[in-house]
Structure formats: structure tokens, C-alpha cells
Amino acid sequence: MTRVLLLGGTAEGRALAKELHPHVEIVSSLAGRVPNPALPIGPVRIGGFGGVEGLRGWLREERIDAVVDATHPFAVTITAHAAQVCGELGLPYLVLARPPWDPGTAIIAVSDIEAADVVAEQGYSRVFLTTGRSGIAAFANSDAWFLIRVVTAPDGTALPRRHKLVLSRGPYGYHDEFALLREQRIDALVTKNSGGKMTRAKLDAAAALGISVVMIARPLLPAGVAAVDSVHRAAMWVAGLPSR
């Protein structure tokens, strides 16, 4: 039976594991950064691999035949490592990346730092920040007030002087997002172009309220990497792998 490492932690990763089970031997791997994560069907490992060398050794030891990368679109480190190691070992490697959002009239930034510069340049005063823990520090010196929504508390991270922290996990509905933006008198939304339906509602609510959007563009995938944008296409790719 084909043995596949599924780099997950996303709804797409869980859906793919469910679709492939029990026809393919799937080992899902989660980064372990979120407490009590939703677990996929089948065997799961949690935690990092120890860089390129650690991942290479693990793939060899576990006799993995192929790797499907269904991590978050901004999980650039593990994607770069997986692409490199699979290339070196000659293992089939596929990225399952949910379709990005259409930015529409959003101001496009290429990094958290650039997004913080846009907030300052545009003079936004009440900002809804949904870039995740890793992006908060870029806004630490901003004069604006921030509503910061994250899954877990950003321990040890520099925070903006004026802010409100909300610990919450999606999915979020349109009406709830609309009410939140209006009640908090938000004049700008800063978000990453994560794509997908689970957190799309904030963009629709912002558009309905005429709220400005600053969207951080997705990082490019490593050169030459094969990618699909649906669970079905990823399952078809796995089904086409040669059997042992």
C-alpha cells in the first residue's frame, strides 16, 4: 500500500485524509502550534521535524512514498523544506493550496511590515488585525487602536500600545463579522490572503460596511512544485501514484 506523508493542520488536510482512508496509508503531520487541534482520521504526528536534515531522516526511516503538503498557504518554512527534501530524495511532492481570495479593491502588501506602513500612511485609526500571531509585532509601534483576533495568546510578542485581544477560532459567519466590525467601529481590516471559506466572511462584511482592506499577498511556491487547489484533485494525484 502506498505510504503518504500528509502535512496538514488545515480543513483541506483533514478532508483529504478522510477521502483517502483506508485505501492509502496516510500519516498526517501537524505543527503543534495550536492547542487541541482538530485531528484528521488515521495516524497523526505532532511537532516539527528538526529542519531539512530531520525531515530527510524521517522520510527515509518511515519509508514514505510521497508527500502532500496541505499546510497553511503562509507556512513557507515547511513548504520550502519539503520541496527541497522531496527533490533530493526523488519523492513525488504535491501542494494542496486552497484558492486565494479575489483581493478586489484591497490594498496589497507583500509583508506584515509593509501592511503596517500602509496603516500608518492611510491614517487608519481602528484596525481589525487577523494576520495571526507571527504578524502582530510589525504593528507594535503603530498609533492606531487594534482589535487583534488570534487562536492562542501571543506570549512574548510585542503588541500595539492600544489594542483589544480576542482569542477565538473560526469558522465565522457573515452576520457575526458584520456586527463585530460595526460595534468596534473598525475602519480598516488587515488580513492575509489565506483563501477558503472558513474566514471569508470578514471580507464580505468589510465590503458591505465600506471598510478598507489591506491584504498581505501569498508567498510564491518553490519553483517547479506541482500544486492543485482542491481536495478532489489531490486525491486523484495520490490515486495515480505507483503502488509498492
Curated annotation (Swiss-Prot):
An annotated GO BP: cobalamin biosynthetic process
Keywords carried by this UniProt record: Cobalamin biosynthesis, NADP, Oxidoreductase
One GO MF term attached to the UniProt entry: precorrin-6A reductase activity
Catalysed reaction, written as an equation: precorrin-6B + NADP(+) = precorrin-6A + NADPH + 2 H(+)
EC number: 1.3.1.54
Pathway per the UniProt entry: Cofactor biosynthesis; adenosylcobalamin biosynthesis; cob(II)yrinate a,c-diamide from precorrin-2 (aerobic route): step 6/10
InterPro entries (alphabetical): Precorrin-6x_reduct
Pfam families in alphabetical order: CbiJ
Entry superkingdom: Bacteria
Keyword NADP: yes
Function: Catalyzes the reduction of the macrocycle of precorrin-6X into precorrin-6Y.
Family assignment from sequence similarity: Belongs to the precorrin-6x reductase family.
Protein name: Precorrin-6A reductase
